[in-house]
């Protein structure tokens, strides 16, 4: 590897350790010519996960976009940001585990709603109202009845 200080094409690894849940390797390197030390990161290049929208257009999966939607749904709710970040990572992990490079936006939305319902029901209803485009109060009432029904079934 080329030294960023003197451009010499020879370095040695001084230290190497896994980071980011063993998804990356952090390496401390030292130039064999000038002794300059610097850090590099090595990680697996993942194929992009493409979301196929309802109208057929395609866009790369965006953790940030999903997180923004979750943050908006959880506004003024007692849900910590790190929980939402972990939720987004687990959703992406599950989508990648399916093995397809393309996923339908409906599948992403349903997965988000399923996970969010287990964290905060109010945030779930907020998210569902935007995602499913609730037209009137009756749709909200039906969704809340479904939540109550699920709670009743879980208790028995």
From Swiss-Prot:
Boundaries of every ATP-cone domain copy: 49-139
Keyword Transcription regulation found: yes
Cofactor: Zn(2+)
Residues in unnamed zinc fingers: 3-34
Co-factor: note: Binds 1 zinc ion.
Family matches, as Pfam families: ATP-cone, Zn_ribbon_NrdR
Stated role: Negatively regulates transcription of bacterial ribonucleotide reductase nrd genes and operons by binding to NrdR-boxes.
Protein name, per record: Transcriptional repressor NrdR
